Amino acid sequence: MESIQKQVSKGFIRIIMLFFVVIALIPILFIVSHSLKGETLILSRFTGESGISVWQQLIIRPFYINLEQFYKVLFRTPQFINLFWNALGITVPIVIGQVLLGILAAYGFSKMKFPGSDKLFFLYVIMMLMPFQVTIVPNYIVLNQLGLIDHYGALILPGIFGTFSTFFLKQFMEGIDEAFIEEARLMGANDMQIIYHLLVPMCKRIIVSTAMMVFINYWGMVEEPITFITTKSKYPLSVYLGTIASENINIGFACSVLYMFLPLLVVLYGQEDLTSGFRITSLK
């Protein structure tokens, strides 16, 4: 009797989980399916010219596959390509810089205890939890004094000094046995050698998962570019997607699919490292 109740309970939980998965996938399926429809069908559906109801507009399955939108985006919309490279040129330096600084800072907080280190790390956590809206004014003042407004440095520098990587990597480094560090010191290794030859190989999966999360976070930033960048041609792709629905809805779905492609590729490539990183960190 008890086993039957457990099976019923597990089945009920699976049904609920499946329901939420389907709900989460509907917007993605909607975007992908409509990216495969022609311009005429898209315009007729979303400009009210077709005479069909709203529910009929939400059809997920395309009537036929048409790559017209992708062709126009990739070969007839140079603005999309330009903003794509803008986004890549902003995000990649942030990921590299933040992860490198995060490794050094995490090592300092976890293996080089000094007076006030716990309080300083607490400030790191507070800064990580602060939303962008809280720091927008002081950030703007500082960046303006440095002459970085309307330059990519206004986005890259604050991103490099973000605290997420430090917080995430510190949790893992604290669990590394001090005996490894002491043995390396006895062999004559300095701190940089310990980090490069010992800790980085041991933290490889955590570092990769951290880099992936930083990439996904900054790939989709919108408020920072709008605030610190005044020239629209310097905007990243994430800002462009916010206006394309009203300006060029006929290619908006294809732009959204292409925008999601790179983060999806990153997640699929490093899926094992990402899940392993979360699992290891949760155990710490």
Indicate residue ranges for each PLM-predicted region.
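A structural signal for multi-pass alpha-helical bundles of membrane permease subunits
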Residues: 2-284
